[in-house]
């Protein structure tokens, strides 16, 4: 066993002595050592209940004849961090999480790992670590929260609360109505109830094969979560015995299938960023062109909030992720069904008995929302390395208008609230990319303000930053190269005409190459916003969004 490095041989007597101080007995040194990578943190509702989850996981691991050791990672709540400097720490926290898991697991030579993530950057951070460490691993997420209901009976979620702020600001609702939405938008523990980033990544974890069937949709408060925990321990023991590791599971074909599910569900645009980062950790050459190819062959089968009033509990009731995959499998060339997963079985075997139980929630292949996926990759002179739009969250397929330019999210939000943006405008928020932000903050506050003011179909928003999974409307993010790297977005001037064509996958500014070249010569890179601490180091090492915004190790040659 891998853990023999710290527990076998006369020279490991000091190691065993220390381990006995934790409560181990001599017989435990013949069992696999299992890392329980938890992410319990009280300020995040999606993680507040994970302390109890950790106890259940440890019980299940012991029952399976293995020895559990629990530790916790950090976490950032994107909703609470939204709209202020805290959001700059969100994406960088993914790297800290990956590094901390790598540190604990490799320093102590664990034989296997069970990861308990849930929210936005915690799930991909742990997934990156699992691929980097490459020991048998199973994921059991904390599960989504239920949707809420106002006193009037309206179904609401966190997106409703953010949009309520814009609606109140523009006089569309009263302060009492906003308070009602606030009080009921997040009714329980769990990841926010729509197809936002957390749930998108937990669903993708399931189809990638790192998590068990049901992981993406079973609610946090559902007793079936406890059954998943028991299964996870049993399956991990099988993976250890068969030496099946994350890199055996997360192949190029598995990533194809993850994006296929993403397209079928219209997941968060952040999934592109995180899954490209996973590919980097797995040593795979996977780029945005391949994502676009997946998008072209996968129909959009279900719309979940913010694209509709359906939530993860509805997906679960309608058959869950397995039912969506089973329906997708009817179309030739969409899924790779014979690859191995964390169950020890193939994807085909995992979904064999699944079925759609409500075709209003999960559409059939014969009745898709659209013939192509709910995410699109756009390219053009404004995004030579690509940009992403959640096409399933807007009915507008082509938009052309003049730029209204802001050099930060704070500046943009203030301008929107002061009425500086009008119908037909293209709002540009730049210098908010991985390096420029730094940290590529999410733009949920500006998009929610636009939607709440009733301009969601009449104003477009472009950024080199990110969008929350709760964002909707004509929102194009991840523009690469970013402004801080001298991308075309940095060269835009007030009033330039921008064209967004979702069907043709184009993002263009109506300015000649000659004029853009002239502007590039005159452009000067702004001083970094942060030069010290973690964010200062992050800004120096982070790569572009089109490669997952991972950290690049300096070349010391």
UniProtKB/Swiss-Prot annotation:
One cellular component (GO) term of this entry: cytosol
Key words of the record: 2Fe-2S, Amino-acid biosynthesis, Branched-chain amino acid biosynthesis, Iron, Iron-sulfur, Lyase, Magnesium, Metal-binding
Residues that coordinate or bind [2Fe-2S] cluster: 119, 192
Reactions mediated catalytically: (2R)-2,3-dihydroxy-3-methylbutanoate = 3-methyl-2-oxobutanoate + H2O; (2R,3R)-2,3-dihydroxy-3-methylpentanoate = (S)-3-methyl-2-oxopentanoate + H2O
UniProt xrefs under Gene3D superfamilies: IlvD/EDD C-terminal domain-like
A single MF term (Gene Ontology): dihydroxy-acid dehydratase activity
BP GO terms, sorted: isoleucine biosynthetic process; L-valine biosynthetic process
Pathway info: Amino-acid biosynthesis; L-isoleucine biosynthesis; L-isoleucine from 2-oxobutanoate: step 3/4; Amino-acid biosynthesis; L-valine biosynthesis; L-valine from pyruvate: step 3/4
Residues that bind Mg(2+): 78, 120-121, 442
EC number: 4.2.1.9
Sequence positions bearing N6-carboxylysine: 121
Cofactor details (free text): Binds 1 [2Fe-2S] cluster per subunit. This cluster acts as a Lewis acid cofactor.
PROSITE patterns noted in UniProt: ILVD_EDD_1 (PS00886), ILVD_EDD_2 (PS00887)
Top-level taxon in the UniProt lineage: Bacteria
Names of the cofactor(s): [2Fe-2S] cluster; Mg(2+)
UniProt similarity note: Belongs to the IlvD/Edd family.
Functional summary from the UniProt entry: Functions in the biosynthesis of branched-chain amino acids. Catalyzes the dehydration of (2R,3R)-2,3-dihydroxy-3-methylpentanoate (2,3-dihydroxy-3-methylvalerate) into 2-oxo-3-methylpentanoate (2-oxo-3-methylvalerate) and of (2R)-2,3-dihydroxy-3-methylbutanoate (2,3-dihydroxyisovalerate) into 2-oxo-3-methylbutanoate (2-oxoisovalerate), the penultimate precursor to L-isoleucine and L-valine, respectively.
Identification of the protein by name: Dihydroxy-acid dehydratase
């Amino acid at each position: 066993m891998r853990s023999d490095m710290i527990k076998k041989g006369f020279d490991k007597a000091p190691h065993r002595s220390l381990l006995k101080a934790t409560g181990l007995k001599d017989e435990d040194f013949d069992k696999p050592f299992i890392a329980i990578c938890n992410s319990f943190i009280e300020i995040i509702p999606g993680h507040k209940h994970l302390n109890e989850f950790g106890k259940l996981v440890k019980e299940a691991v012991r029952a399976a004849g293995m020895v559990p050791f629990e530790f916790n990672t950090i976490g950032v709540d994107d909703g609470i961090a939204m709209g202020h400097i805290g959001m700059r720490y969100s994406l960088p926290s993914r790297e800290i999480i990956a590094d901390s898991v790598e540190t604990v697991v490799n320093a102590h030579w664990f034989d296997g790992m069970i990861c308990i993530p849930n929210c936005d950057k915690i799930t991909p951070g742990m997934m990156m670590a699992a691929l980097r460490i490459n020991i048998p691993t199973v994921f059991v997420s904390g599960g989504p929260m239920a949707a809420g209901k106002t006193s009037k009976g309206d179904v609401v979620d966190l997106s409703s609360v953010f949009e309520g702020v814009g609606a109140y600001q523009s006089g569309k609702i009263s302060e009492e109505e906003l308070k009602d939405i606030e009080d009921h938008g997040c009714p329980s523990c769990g990841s926010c109830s729509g197809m936002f980033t957390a749930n998108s990544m937990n669903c993708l974890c399931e189809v990638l094969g790192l998590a068990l069937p049901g992981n993406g949709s079973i609610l946090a408060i559902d007793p079936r979560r406890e059954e998943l925990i028991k299964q996870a321990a049993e399956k991990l023991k099988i993976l250890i015995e068969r030496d099946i590791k994350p890199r055996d599971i997360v192949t190029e074909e598995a990533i194809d299938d993850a994006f296929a599910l993403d397209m079928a569900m219209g997941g968060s645009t952040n999934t592109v960023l995180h899954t490209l980062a996973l590919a980097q950790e797995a040593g795979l050459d996977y780029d945005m062109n391949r994502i676009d190819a997946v998008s072209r062959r996968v129909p959009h089968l279900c719309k979940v909030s913010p694209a509709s009033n359906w939530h993860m509990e509805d997906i679960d009731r309608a058959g869950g992720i397995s039912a969506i995959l089973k329906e997708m499998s009817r179309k030739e060339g969409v899924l790779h069904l014979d690859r191995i997963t964390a169950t020890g079985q193939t994807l085909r075997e995992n979904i064999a008995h699944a079925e759609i139980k409500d075709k209003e929630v999960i559409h059939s292949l014969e009745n898709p929302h659209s013939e192509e996926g709910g995410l699109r990759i756009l390219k053009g002179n404004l995004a030579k390395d690509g940009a992403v739009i959640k096409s399933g969250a807007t009915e507008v397929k082509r938009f052309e208008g003049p730029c209204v330019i802001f050099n930060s999210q704070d500046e943009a939000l203030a301008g929107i609230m002061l009425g500086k943006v009008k119908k037909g405008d293209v709002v540009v928020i730049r210098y908010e990319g991985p390096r420029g932000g730094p940290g590529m903050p999410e733009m949920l506050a500006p998009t929610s303000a636009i939607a709440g003011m009733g301009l969601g179909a009449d104003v477009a928003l472009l950024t080199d930053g990110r969008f929350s999974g709760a964002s909707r409307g004509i929102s194009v993010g991840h523009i690469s190269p970013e402004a801080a790297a001298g991308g075309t977005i940095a060269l835009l001037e007030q009033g330039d005409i921008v064209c967004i064509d979702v069907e043709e996958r184009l993002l263009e500014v109506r300015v000649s190459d000659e004029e853009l070249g002239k502007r590039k010569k005159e452009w000067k890179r702004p001083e970094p916003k942060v030069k010290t601490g973690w964010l200062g180091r992050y800004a120096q090492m982070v790569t572009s969004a089109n490669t997952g915004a991972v950290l690049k190790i300096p070349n010391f040659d």
